């Protein structure tokens, strides 16, 4: 959609992200100095991210144990934020302590942050699939699956696995007049995902 606005209407769309607890803006997708010289495709890759932290907002990403993860655009973890405009508690104390020991608030999102500080949300913490100690983004997997020409809609859920705790199950709605099957969908996904991201099964539903 961003690409169509730029190419067809000469409209530049700037991505931003926030939440009520942040009053509300947390990031904005403003380019850094020199980025205007990048190619169109390189700029689109940046614009698809939620952007850099806004004034006086700090961000970090952590694993399940609270250990900070590197800003490399690849490792994704819990997104936490800190700043003077960010809520420190809910009304009447609902939810108890909502800040960690460094004063960071857990947004409930899963994200990556690249070397230049651009953040990209990949999932919600409650939706991410945890398989053998690794995280699989249900949203990213769904977005790739709907790229299959015979798939109209896709949803990914985690199902119990005795060894890996959870494994992804892909649920697809076939495109009108199409009859995809498990094998051709998995073949389509195979070179687009890490091997351990591949769903254990694919089921098809009418809607």
Q: Where do the PLM segments sit?
A:
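Short Gly/Pro-enriched turn/cap motifs at secondary-structure boundaries
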Residues: 44-53, 100-103
């Amino acid at each position: 959609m961003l690409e169509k606005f730029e190419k067809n209407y000469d409209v530049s769309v700037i991505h931003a992200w926030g939440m009520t607890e942040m009053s509300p803006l947390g990031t904005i997708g403003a380019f850094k100095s020199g980025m205007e010289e990048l190619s169109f495709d390189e700029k689109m890759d940046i614009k698809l991210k939620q952007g850099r932290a806004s004034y006086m907002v700090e961000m970090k990403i952590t694993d399940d144990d609270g250990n900070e993860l590197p800003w490399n655009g690849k490792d994704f973890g819990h997104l936490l934020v800190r700043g003077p405009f960010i809520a420190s508690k809910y009304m009447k104390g609902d939810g108890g302590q909502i800040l960690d020991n460094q004063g960071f608030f857990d947004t409930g999102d899963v994200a990556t942050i690249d070397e230049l500080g651009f953040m990209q949300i990949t999932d919600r913490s409650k939706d991410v699939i945890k398989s053998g100690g690794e995280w699989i983004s249900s949203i990213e997997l769904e977005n790739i699956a709907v790229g299959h020409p015979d798939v109209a809609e896709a949803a990914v859920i985690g199902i119990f696995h005795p060894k890996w705790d959870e494994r992804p199950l892909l649920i697809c709605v076939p495109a009108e007049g199409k009859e995809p099957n498990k094998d051709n969908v998995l073949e389509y996904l195979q070179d687009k995902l890490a091997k351990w991201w591949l769903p254990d099964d694919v089921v098809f539903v009418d809607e």
